A protein has these predicted regions:
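Mixed-charge (Asp/Glu-Lys/Arg
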Residues: 1-220, 283-317
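Hydrophobic positions on the alpha1 helix immediately C-terminal to the Walker A/P-loop
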Residues: 226-227
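Conserved P-loop NTPase "ATPase switch" module shared by AAA+ and STAND
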Residues: 211, 216-222, 231-291
Length: 317
């Protein structure tokens, strides 16, 4: 069920991740769920604990689902995560811990990257208790389906697990590789040096309805660096709220954009079908050089970097 693409993670890969890299899975699994929810058009009010926040009391996360999806019911969802080898035990412990204060309008959702053989039986028993409006459980096979519906998250977790998605790369990974290609490494603030107005305009456009945004620069990497700087700053150094993804072929572009979603797509190939991506909920950012005609009305001309601010960017690292 991986669309014939071995460069993308499957249910078996998620299971193997939890088994062989347990600490890594424990650290990054909440971030994966957050990215999946961000790319789910029906989801809002998303709050997922990641990093140091996972040790705090309370649910691991929550979200509001406006209408049912293939995997999630509508309503206020309360999430618990478990990456350890016995999902039945962990789910039961989490459920018992929460049911005394459960509300009849809440949905309890337990999510694991492992395969869970008796998942449906466990759900049926808990559902019959009536503590929650509904009880759901998602395992590795469910997550594989969800990833197919959330291509940017699919690419991100595949990169994390050392796979190399064909003709696609997250802007996060591109920046990590590009910034380290020099010595010293390039600071992300370098690419907004003297470009406060351009950054403000871009953030304003991104805050509106999905659209085509054109960035004109003298060189492609400069425009991508500007994108990385603005989006990282907007999301407090985390790209997950916008899921910016670079696409390098029409084949991969068409596969990603035919289903509803959200986020930012950056086509680096000739004549992408931007209308399809936009109508399905995604912003499209095209990179133009000085000789390329624009196709939309929203164009940002990147001025040359301000020398003194560029020096300050290196000094502040």
């Amino acid at each position: 069920m991986n669309n014939g693409n071995p460069e993308l993670i499957t249910a078996s890969g998620l299971k193997r991740w939890a088994e062989t890299k347990s600490r890594d899975a424990q650290s990054y699994f909440p971030e994966l769920i957050r990215r999946l929810l961000v790319e789910t058009p029906e989801a809002s009010e998303i709050s997922i604990r990641t990093g140091d926040g996972v040790s705090l009391p309370g649910y691991d996360g929550e979200a509001i689902i406006k209408k049912p999806t293939k995997l999630l019911p509508a309503g206020l969802l309360r999430f618990e995560f478990g990456t350890n080898k016995d999902p039945n035990k962990k789910a039961t412990e989490d459920y018992n811990k929460r049911k005394e204060k459960a509300s009849s309008d809440e949905v309890f959702v337990f999510v694991t990257p492992r395969r869970w053989r008796n998942k449906e039986e466990w759900v049926s028993r808990r559902q019959a208790e009536g503590s929650f409006k509904e009880v759901k459980a998602l395992d590795a096979d469910d997550l594989e389906l969800w990833l197919q519906l959330a291509p940017s998250a699919h690419i991100w977790i595949s990169e994390k697990l050392d796979l190399h998605p064909r003709d696609a790369i997250t802007l996060e990974k591109w920046w990590d590789e590009f910034s380290k290609s020099t010595d010293p490494s390039l600071p992300v603030k370098l690419f907004v040096a003297g470009r406060n107005a351009a950054a403000r305009d871009f953030r304003s456009m991104l805050g509106g309805d999905p659209r085509l945004i054109s960035l004109r620069s003298e060189w492609e990497d400069d425009a991508l660096g500007f994108l990385a700087a603005v989006l990282a700053e907007q999301n407090e150094t985390n790209f997950s709220n916008t899921s910016p993804t670079i696409i390098r072929s029409a084949e991969v572009w068409d596969r990603i954009t035919t289903s509803p979603g959200s986020g930012v797509l950056i086509p680096l190939f000739y004549d992408p079908n931007t209308n399809c991506a936009i109508s399905n909920g995604r912003h499209v950012v095209e990179v133009l050089d000085s000789n390329t005609a624009r196709r939309g009305k929203d164009v940002i001309e990147l001025p040359r970097l301000n020398r003194s601010e560029a020096v300050d960017a290196f000094r502040s690292e």
